[in-house]
Amino acid sequence: MNGIAYEVAFWNNVYRWKWTFDGMMNWSKYGGVITLEGFDANAFLIKTDNPKVLDVGCGMSYATGNHIMRDGRLMPLDIRYIDPLAAYFNRIMARHRRKMPEIEFGMAEYLSAFYPSHDISLVVIQNALDHSANPMKSIYESIDVLKKGGCLYLNHHINEAETEHYKGFHQYNICREDGKLIIWNKNERHDVAELTAGFAELTVG
């Protein structure tokens, strides 16, 4: 809970001023093809009819893009923006009259309570899993809502809790060790591949 005030104040300041909002939108992929670092999301999604995407813990950046390119045509993508602070974020957008998609309330740790099982093509979590109250449960829940052959895409700063001295939402670290994806803090340590073996394949970039 300690991080809520900081997050709300940060995004309010971004949306409040034209120059900060325009600066964010200049690097955002919103309005264009979905773009994820190290993963060709468009190529993955066009293999599926009517793909669905969840951007979980999205904040207010709209960074990933909301279209796919299929047969040379730019087509709208069914993408849902999800964050536990949705009520705060939607009020910020309304206050500053920004015309962006509404953010839906949802929590990674309980994703299957908000969305049907085996229905989603791609779940995106960027710089948010380490803010979760239970990162491994968030991974399990994300896998539960994915279709067979679906993808959970994770992209995070390395060991952010250590960098931020465990302040606010920064309670877990994520890193790569000997090719393994590890989630850890001072009290626990998890090898993600080991805990998802048998029902998920893991690629660490």
Predicted regions and their residues:
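Class I SAM-dependent methyltransferase Rossmann-like catalytic core
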Residues: 1-48
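Nucleotide donor/acceptor-binding cores
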Residues: 51
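Class I SAM-dependent methyltransferase SAM/SAH-binding core
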Residues: 54-111
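A short acidic, Gly/Pro-enriched loop at the edge of an enzyme's catalytic core
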Residues: 106, 110-123
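A short SAM/SAH-binding and catalytic strip from SAM-dependent methyltransferases
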Residues: 121-134
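A short glycine-rich, Lys/Arg-flanked "PGG" loop and its adjoining helix->strand segment in the class I
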Residues: 136-148
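Conserved class I S-adenosyl-L-methionine
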Residues: 153-181
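A SAM-dependent methyltransferase catalytic signature shared across enzymes that methylate proteins
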Residues: 174-205
